[in-house]
């Protein structure tokens, strides 16, 4: 069994290298990293909430979003801006969206047209969804 895990890990590492498997979540993570109050959080924590933002940006199925939010909560990963110590101010959203769109090409791996407005809106909607789940008031 261990050999199978090692072999699968090696295979997936090679496949991941081919396209890095990176898109919106990593692009948005990069924007979060521009906010000083979020510097204490780990890469994976920022990508976790970035994934929720990506799903909103892609207009993903509500059942998938529900499943992801519940998983993130179960493993104590961020589901809203406050979980990353980021205030949802226009200034912060502008910094995040600008960096995501203009300084990190990963966002352009998304199969949709993205711009600063769509990124800001996705972050705000993901934040609202995450906060509602965290408060026990399910949005979906």
Label the predicted regions:
Residues 1-74:
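Active-site segments that bind and position negatively charged phosphate/pyrophosphate groups
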């Amino acid at each position: 069994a261990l050999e199978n895990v090692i072999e699968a890990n090696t295979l997936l590492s090679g496949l991941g290298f081919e396209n890095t498997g990176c898109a919106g979540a990593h692009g948005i993570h990069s924007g979060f990293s521009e906010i000083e109050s979020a510097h204490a959080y780990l890469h994976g924590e920022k990508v976790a909430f970035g994934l929720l933002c990506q799903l909103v940006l892609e207009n993903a199925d509500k059942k998938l979003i529900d499943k992801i939010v519940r998983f993130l909560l179960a493993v104590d990963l961020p589901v809203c801006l406050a979980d990353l110590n980021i205030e949802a101010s226009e200034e912060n959203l502008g910094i995040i969206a600008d960096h995501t769109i203009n300084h990190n090409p990963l966002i352009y791996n998304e199969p949709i047209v993205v711009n600063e407005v769509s990124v800001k809106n996705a972050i705000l909607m993901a934040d609202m969804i995450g906060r509602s789940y965290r408060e026990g008031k399910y949005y979906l």
